[in-house]
């Protein structure tokens, strides 16, 4: 059952209360009981979008993040005095990773934790007979090991990142717009905000433009790259008779003007930047790191209204005398803890039924239903000999190309390749269409897989990643168990997911298309032939807290306000109710912008929440 604020406080251990009173968080000593306008759980780019817009509108925001702040952008003001560090910086901006992108693979691996790990046979036949082993029929459980997870229904590679900035501290920065709806693919594509097609296009275009401005999307940062130009124009030439479009991949980044060999990748830090570098805004914002949002509590009246958020100071667990749990009260509550974290908090609050079938008294009956993910095909190729040979000849008559090659050959006469060491990587895509219903990335980047050994020079390797779309179906579920907890003492997530036949057919065609495109570029790297990746590896889980028009099939309305709740909002990729192949971050930011404007309008009384605030490098 869901808890009221009074029940939460009554159940709270007397030993943890302060002088027998409600253990309020220390922020209320500064702001008072009614001084917090917006509580946000989660500090990724979506939570940061809410924070930026709300703070710029003059609202006081308290944000909690379960992880630590471990990457910072340090700025120096013009007069030379130090400006405070801004958290959530993209870790790939470190020079060592820009010089050797394959080393960044291990950073990504270290930042990801699997969500649900099936418990396999733990019998080790060659183990010392006197050593411990699990009794027959039982298993050890820790760090995501889940005895309830059936392997054939799992998204085995689905993972989460805990830390300020979330996955934006290591993401690929790909920010395409999700394609508009297509009649031949119902349930897939950009979700509708209006049933009037013209109004829907107008609103989405405005939201996408604002999101692109906020995160700093560009398609021009790799224009003066030999490899990018070679791959892009070669594919355009190969497919010109079929009129298939190949174009630069939209990326949230900018090339440094004074050091053009480096690109700066954007992250949540770019959204936090204006807050941390404006004294007035900074006073309106509090970020509590290493704080878990445990659950939410209702006010206890007839209205479904959140009265408090219970948070736990994870660092205080090291000191038994420290205050572990406390309560934060706000006017509005925003959950931006990811497609796993949001339903986990709501489930732990008692707002949804157990297991697969919702209970009749569930406050949020569609929580964790209709989930979608992206089947993913991957390969790596080594560029064709004739393409590499053509580099010396400046085949497209570009002055910057000719100069870069000449300088490289002059400085490095023993190098077998004419491609400069610091030549930017390719960043190419072909759009999602009815004929080719998948998103593509033809590039060279670091993921949790696809690292290249020393045998082949990275300059001639191209990665091909194809992302498919799956159909939203009510029986594809994310459920939670009380008898098993994750590594952070929250209910263990379990997937009940099976793709539709139509989704599988599209995935087969997607693989064939990737192989055809790859054959136009070069030969397969023996260690990375065409393959389907583990389910969930795209890390684009969606639909867990889906929003939309239909209360019967969604969790919240199009302003992300949970149905029948007065002040509870959901945010992030989980809000996207449709299937899609593109990277979802930009679309989730659009939902956040629309939602933040609604919150500002409610709390400020009549403003639309739009702003023209400045932000770093954009």
Curated annotation (Swiss-Prot):
Its cofactor is FAD. Binds 1 FAD covalently per subunit. The keyword DNA repair does not apply. The active site is at 540 (proton acceptor), 583. Pfam families: GMC_oxred_C. PANTHER family: PYRANOSE 2-OXIDASE. Catalyzes the oxidation of various aldopyranoses and disaccharides on carbon-2 to the corresponding 2-keto sugars concomitant with the reduction of O(2) to H(2)O(2). This is Pyranose 2-oxidase. It comes from Lyophyllum shimeji.
């Amino acid at each position: 059952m869901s808890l009221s604020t009074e029940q939460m406080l009554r159940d709270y251990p007397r030993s943890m209360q302060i002088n027998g009173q409600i253990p309020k968080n220390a922020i209320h000593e500064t702001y008072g009981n009614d001084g917090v306008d917006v509580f946000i759980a989660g500090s990724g780019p979506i939570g940061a979008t809410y924070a930026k817009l709300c703070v710029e509108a003059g609202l006081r925001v308290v944000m909690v993040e379960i992880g630590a702040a471990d990457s910072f952008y340090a700025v120096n003001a013009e007069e030379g005095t130090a400006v405070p560090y801004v958290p959530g910086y993209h870790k790939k901006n470190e020079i060592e990773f820009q010089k050797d992108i394959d080393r960044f693979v291990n950073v990504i691996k270290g930042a990801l934790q699997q969500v649900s790990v099936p418990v396999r046979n733990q019998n080790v036949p060659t183990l010392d007979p006197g050593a411990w082993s699990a009794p027959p029929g039982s298993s050890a459980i820790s760090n995501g090991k889940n005895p309830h997870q059936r392997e054939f229904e799992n998204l085995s590679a689905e993972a989460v990142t805990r830390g300020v900035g979330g996955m934006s501290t290591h993401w690929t920065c790909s920010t395409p717009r999700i394609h508009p709806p297509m009649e031949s693919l119902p349930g897939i594509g950009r979700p509708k905000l209006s049933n009037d097609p013209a109004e829907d296009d107008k609103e989405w275009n405005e939201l996408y433009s604002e999101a692109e401005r906020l995160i700093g999307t560009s398609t021009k940062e790799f224009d003066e790259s030999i490899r990018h130009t070679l791959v892009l124009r070669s594919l355009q030439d190969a497919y010109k008779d079929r009129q298939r479009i190949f174009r630069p991949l939209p990326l949230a980044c900018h090339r440094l003007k004074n050091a053009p060999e480096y690109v700066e990748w954007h992250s949540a830090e770019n959204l936090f930047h204006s807050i941390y570098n404006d004294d007035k805004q900074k006073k309106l914002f509090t970020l509590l790191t290493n704080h878990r949002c445990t659950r939410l509590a209702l006010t206890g009246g007839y209205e479904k209204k959140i009265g408090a958020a219970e948070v736990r100071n994870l660092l205080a667990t090291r000191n038994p005398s420290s205050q572990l749990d406390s309560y934060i009260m706000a006017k509005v509550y925003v959950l931006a803890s990811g497609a796993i974290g949001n339903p986990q908090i709501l489930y732990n609050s008692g707002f949804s039924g157990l297991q697969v079938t919702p209970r009749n008294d569930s406050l949020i009956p569609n929580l964790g239903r209709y989930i979608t993910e992206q089947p993913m095909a991957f390969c790596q190729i080594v560029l064709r000999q004739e393409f590499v040979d053509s580099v010396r000849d400046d085949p497209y008559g570009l002055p910057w190309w000719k100069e870069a090659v000449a300088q490289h050959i002059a400085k490095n006469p023993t190098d077998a390749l004419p491609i400069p060491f610091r030549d930017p990587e390719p960043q190419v895509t072909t759009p999602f269409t009815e004929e080719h219903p998948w998103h593509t990335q033809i590039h060279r980047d670091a993921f949790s897989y696809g690292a290249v050994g020393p045998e082949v020079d990275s300059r001639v390797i191209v990665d091909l990643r194809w992302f498919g779309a799956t159909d939203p179906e009510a029986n594809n579920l994310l459920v939670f168990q009380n008898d098993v907890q994750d590594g952070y003492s929250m209910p263990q997530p379990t997937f009940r997911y099976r793709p539709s036949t139509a989704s599988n057919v599209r995935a087969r065609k997607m693989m064939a298309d990737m192989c055809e495109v790859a054959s136009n570029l070069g030969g397969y790297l023996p260690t990375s032939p065409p393959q389907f990746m583990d389910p969930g590896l795209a890390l684009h889980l969606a639909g867990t807290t889906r929003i939309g028009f239909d209360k019967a099939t969604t969790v919240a309305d199009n302003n992300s306000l949970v149905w029948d709740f007065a002040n509870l909002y959901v945010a992030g990729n989980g809000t996207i109710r449709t299937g899609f192949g593109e990277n979802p971050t930009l679309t989730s930011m659009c939902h956040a912008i629309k939602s933040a404007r609604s919150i500002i309008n409610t709390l400020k009384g009549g403003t639309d929440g739009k702003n023209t605030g400045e932000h770093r490098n954009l």
